[in-house]
Amino acid sequence: MPKVQADGLPLPQRYGAILTIVIGISMAVLDGAIANVALPTIATDLHATPASSIWVVNAYQIAIVISLLSFSFLGDMFGYRRIYKCGLVVFLLSSLFCALSDSLQMLTLARVIQGFGGAALMSVNTALIRLIYPQRFLGRGMGINSFIVAVSSAAGPTIAAAILSIASWKWLFLINVPLGIIALLLAMRFLPPNGSRASKPRFDLPSAVMNALTFGLLITALSGFAQGQSLTLIAAELVVMVVVGIFFIRRQLSLPVPLLPVDLLRIPLFSLSICTSVCSFCAQMLAMVSLPFYLQTVLGRSEVETGLLLTPWPLATMVMAPLAGYLIER
């Protein structure tokens, strides 16, 4: 295990650490986009309705949303390296579980577990980059990381189309197994530990539960609205979300080390950025989930054609991401 460095890792170890980060974040991002193209095929193979098969995507996204902050906090407590390795193990095993699933319920459960693994990888990704790169190259490291995320998102539909053209949808998940093993071996060898801390922050379980309920109910309500669920049920979910959210915010304001630093929301520009990001994420998710069904069921496109037709959207994001970063610096 590399020793803690005052200013990043030395070059031989740095390359190995960067590689495991690249593999891990690529898998986590890809699995958020790669299943969309296969949803009609999965629904047919598992004898599920199109509406119920959407939970293959929703389960993964909701698991990430409700656990991301908690894993980030646990990384501060127990070490980013440890959380990252645990995330790789969970992601690897749950990917195998996904491939072996023979019912929609089993696949949905596997995707929930996989989402927790993906959240663990994403939550400590930026913190590990700060430990890996020297301070003078930190901006470059963040830029490379953003580029990998954009490329993985853009490549998702194309990779899915390529795999589905020659193999079963199960291989969308099986491909993670060898990649996960390689990333885990690299992580054990090259990732640095956390720097020493005077004291460890205390994990607040009620905050984690309220965080999960607040964001989980929000995503569930939005998904239910898109699927045409009962407005009464959706309204009830939103009411519970607001009530729990109020208690969650009040508790965060009273904690010395909160799970979510809500005091930052008092900054108008920060609040506007968060609201814009949430709305953008919801709109993109609704479109990326519904478009494969429209293209394959209504327009009669094949899986390969669907993947290619979905590629320009994230590809444009990949092209614009570096430009946006440059404009932010200006």
Where are these regions (language model features)?
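12-transmembrane solute porter fold
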Residues: 15-30, 35-37, 50, 206, ...
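Extracellular/periplasmic helix-loop-helix junction of adjacent transmembrane segments
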Residues: 38-67, 106-109, 299, 304-309
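Small-residue-mediated transmembrane helix hinge/kink sites in multi-pass secondary transporters
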Residues: 40, 72-73, 126-127, 160-161, ...
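Short hydrophobic/small-residue motifs within alpha-helical transmembrane segments
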Residues: 61-62, 150-151, 314-315
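Helix-to-loop junctions at the C-terminal end of transmembrane segments
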Residues: 69-80, 320-330
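Helix-loop-helix hairpins in multi-pass membrane proteins, especially solute transporters
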Residues: 73-206, 224, 233
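Hydrophobic transmembrane-helix bundles of small-molecule transporters
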Residues: 165-276
